[in-house]
From Swiss-Prot:
Protein source organism: Felis catus
Other observations noted: This chain binds calcium.
Calcium listed as a keyword: yes
Protein name per Swiss-Prot or TrEMBL: Myosin light chain 5
Subunit structure: Myosin is a hexamer of 2 heavy chains and 4 light chains.
Record's keyword terms, sorted: Calcium, Metal-binding, Motor protein, Muscle protein, Myosin, Repeat
SMART domains: EFh
Reported tissue expression: Jaw-closing muscles.
Keyword set includes Membrane: no
A Gene Ontology term for the protein's cellular component: myosin complex
GO molecular-function terms, A-Z: calcium ion binding
Region of interest called Disordered, as start-end residue ranges on this chain: 1-22
Length: 173
């Protein structure tokens, strides 16, 4: 048994392991877990890879059903191969290099705002936060909303909220 492992390592397996493990050293363990949850949510057919159908299903679950095939193809072409979890981490590592936390939060909100209005219905956000990935409690969401600007129609200004979440105070106009 040990000789098989040794042969595998001598055959280049170790080099591949080193290359793939570098991406894991770029993130904290909690971040890797969050990426794993995001990957699992996107891997709709649970085959360990994100493909075009997974992307379509993910967009549909976010209410965006008019995404074009060429847009999906362009997203998939950003990867240098099939998008397994390691490739997913590599892609996000490259995208997040040089971005700050506020920009990252804003980009997440923008995914839920296909019209680019700068606001999202607070009830919709509350449902998502309580049902997806690291599920928040109603109390946690309500506590976050205390720092949010919400208009009379119930729309949350996510740009202002992103600023408060990352800087701890409202931006002075």
């Amino acid at each position: 048994m040990a000789s098989r492992k040794t042969k595998k390592k001598e055959g280049g397996g170790l080099r591949a392991q080193r290359a793939s493990s570098n991406v894991f050293s770029n993130f904290e363990q909690t971040q890797i877990q969050e990426f794993k949850e995001a990957f699992t949510l996107m891997d709709q057919n649970r085959d360990g890879f994100i493909d075009k159908e997974d992307l379509k299903d993910t967009y549909a679950s976010l209410g965006k059903t008019n995404i074009k095939d060429d847009e999906l193809d362009a997203m998939l072409k950003e990867a240098s191969g099939p998008i397994n979890f390691t490739m997913f981490l590599n892609m996000f590592g490259a995208k997040l290099t040089g971005t700050d936390a506020e920009e990252t939060i804003l980009n997440a909100f923008k995914m839920l705002d296909p019209e680019g209005k700068g606001s999202i219905n607070k009830d919709y956000i509350k449902r998502l936060l309580m049902s997806q990935a690291d599920k928040m409690t109603a109390e946690e969401v309500d506590q976050m909303f205390q720092f949010a600007t919400i208009d009379a129609a119930g729309n949350l200004d996510y740009k202002a909220l992103s600023y408060v979440l990352t800087h701890g105070e409202e931006k002075e106009e």
